[in-house]
Amino acid sequence: MMNAKNVFFNDIYIHMITISLILFYTVISSLYILLNDDYNIILRIFVIFIIAAAVILMMKKETFLPFLGLTVLPSPLIANEKIPTGANLSYTINMSEHPDGTLIVYWAANKTDAIIEDPFEAYKNYNNVGVSKVKNGKAEVRIFCPDRYKVNKVFNQLLERHFHYRIVFKETGFLSPVMTVKVNC
């Protein structure tokens, strides 16, 4: 049986390494063609666009961490509204570009009053989660103060308090890419 850490290592790290190698090779090969006078001028101009596309992909977090991007989940599986019982913090998200009734799903690290050693422990059992409905162009997020946690495997850093959310597009089943809001508490 695979646990979440094994899935993370096997799928995500392999994906990150593969994409990094492909993008690195693309940029190096394109630079070689661009800087070599033996190649046709049209090809050399074309590789400028290839380099630009590779750089744009490198700058997007979803390129390396695809689970943060657009995804699909049948909207009937998402509760209408849910607030963590006893949540004591409230944040308002401007959703004026979305119609009233649009749902957002949100989640934050658990509250333990300690720095948590890894993301899997930080979100364990997903106790600090909810679903909010847009009303008058705003969505209210109610959570407990999330703890800071460490990400040691890739970035080796301490992440400050924050919560994530996705917008639910009911008609299509799409969920927006993950968005993050920093929290002061």
PLM regions with names:
Residues 2-9, 30-33, 43-46, 55-185:
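Beta-strand-dominated extracellular/periplasmic modules and repeats
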Residues 38-50:
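Hydrophobic alpha-helical transmembrane segments
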